Amino acid sequence: MSNKGQLLQDPFLNALRKEHVPVSIYLVNGIKLQGNIESFDQYVVLLRNTVTQMVYKHAISTVVPARAVNFRVDEASDA
């Protein structure tokens, strides 16, 4: 994954994790998962509901927070 992609993903996912915002994650096959982001890295997201699921990022289509989230992206980027 490009560094520019990480510049957007990391602050967004980290804000969702820190603020314990419930999310709906839609997979590329149409399945909807719901829960809270427990952790993430370059390749996976740990999603917690009644159990913790490891979801591979390449399978994720969309992440939809239950409420608006403010997150900061580096001002130095050209995004």
Swiss-Prot record:
Keywords: RNA-binding, Stress response
Record flagged with keyword Hydrolase: no
InterPro entries tied to this protein: Hfq (IPR005001), LSM_dom_sf (IPR010920), Sm (IPR047575)
Pfam families with a match to the protein in the record: Hfq
GO molecular function terms attached to this record: RNA binding
GO cellular component: cytosol
Single GO biological process annotation from the record: regulation of RNA stability
PROSITE patterns: SM (PS52002)
All copies of domain Sm, residue ranges: 10-69
HAMAP family in alphabetical order: Hfq
Function: RNA chaperone that binds small regulatory RNA (sRNAs) and mRNAs to facilitate mRNA translational regulation in response to envelope stress, environmental stress and changes in metabolite concentrations. Also binds with high specificity to tRNAs.
Subunit structure: Homohexamer.
Family: Belongs to the Hfq family.
Protein name as annotated: RNA-binding protein Hfq
